[in-house]
């Protein structure tokens, strides 16, 4: 089995829930005088981060993630947990001069979110392309790579390294669309086989770069825009396919569903499935994560996932 190179944030998530509506609370507020406070009776602290969320969900599917990231002084226990889960920490840098990145995410009763992200140690990290710990040692095992949101300098180093190594790249800029320059965004898209973002992020990415779907597809093989409970739009040179979402039994918190989708997508890409089936598995994985409080499933019933895909789409996936 080939490996998937994953670079993204390694973080702790603080999840807060607001029983009202952010939209209602902000009605009539003058933005230049904005001062609001939300009472949150629900508090949870979880292991999170885009990189680790994707890696763990991929591992549950039976994939072999190669995780690259940075943790801080409080990251030792997180690394120990990853090792217990069978995820190598060989390329996780541990800094002694900062804390691990932390995300604080508030969700209202309509699943709207307000988030703050402190990069912590990730802002001080480095890309392991030289020295005693060198990604070149594992290059031959890597089939695909995903570059997700983290320190923008390291994102660009990752994109360039993957390009120099001829590694198939999935570009996932996420919240860092506004942290990368227009030239960096355009060059990253040009060097990628696939681009993925949610509907809101695609609007910003398109506006900033001036690129429409057809422009992305001049160089990339596909563009995936996730649409929440409406499913996924898969854009290829053949056209656009709307793939419905998989229904969850219950929605506890939507945080992490996108990362779970990416894990399913990458699992399929490594298996050389067609893009539609990759997205279907991603949708099934996302539906599992929204049923829990947190972004990383404790366990996964693979037969249940395959059955959910079959029931939703009428298609058996290869195992």
Task: List PLM regions with ranges.
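Ribokinase/PfkB-type carbohydrate-kinase core domain
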Residues: 1-20, 43, 80-98, 105-242, ...
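Glycine-rich phosphate/adenosyl-contacting loop at the front of the ribokinase-like
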Residues: 1-66, 77, 319
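Gly/Ala-rich phosphate-binding loop of Rossmann-like dinucleotide-binding domains
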Residues: 59, 163, 270
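Conserved post-catalytic alpha-helical subdomain immediately downstream of the catalytic base
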Residues: 218-222, 227-229, 246-319
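Short, basic and Ser/Thr-rich N-terminal targeting/leader segments
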Residues: 48, 61, 98-100, 228
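Short pre-catalytic strand/loop immediately N-terminal to key active-site residues, enriched for Gly-Thr
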Residues: 37-46, 244-256
């Amino acid at each position: 089995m080939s490996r998937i190179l994953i670079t993204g944030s390694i973080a702790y998530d603080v999840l807060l829930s607001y029983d009202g509506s952010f939209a209602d609370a902000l009605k009539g507020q003058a933005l230049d005088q904005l001062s609001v406070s939300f009472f949150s009776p629900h508090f949870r602290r979880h292991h999170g981060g885009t990189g680790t969320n994707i890696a763990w969900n991929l591992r549950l599917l039976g994939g072999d993630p190669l995780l690259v990231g940075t943790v801080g002084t409080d990251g030792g226990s997180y690394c120990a947990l990853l090792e217990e889960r069978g995820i190598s920490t060989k390329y996780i840098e541990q800094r002694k001069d900062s804390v691990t990145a932390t995300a604080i995410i508030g969700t209202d009763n309509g699943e709207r979110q307000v988030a703050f992200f402190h990069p912590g140690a990730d802002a001080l990290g480095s890309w392991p392309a030289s020295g005693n710990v060198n990604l070149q040692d594992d290059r031959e095992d890597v089939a695909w790579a995903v570059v997700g949101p983290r320190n923008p300098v390291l994102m660009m180093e990752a994109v360039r390294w993957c390009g120099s190594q001829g590694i198939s790249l999935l570009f996932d800029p996420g919240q860092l669309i506004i942290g990368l320059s227009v030239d960096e965004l355009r060059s990253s898209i040009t060097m990628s086989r696939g681009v993925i973002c949610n509907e809101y992020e695609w609007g910003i990415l398109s506006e900033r770069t001036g690129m429409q779907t057809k422009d992305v597809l001049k160089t990339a093989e596909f563009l995936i825009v996730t649409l929440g409970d409406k499913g996924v739009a898969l854009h290829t040179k053949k056209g656009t396919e709307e793939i419905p979402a998989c229904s969850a039994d219950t929605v506890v918190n939507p945080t992490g569903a996108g990362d779970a989708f990416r894990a399913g997508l990458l699992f399929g890409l490594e298996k050389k499935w067609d893009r539609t089936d990759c997205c279907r598995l991603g949708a099934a994985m996302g539906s599992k994560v929204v049923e829990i409080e947190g972004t990383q499933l404790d366990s996964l019933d693979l037969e249940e996932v395959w059955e959910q895909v079959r029931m939703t789409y009428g298609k058996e996936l290869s195992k």
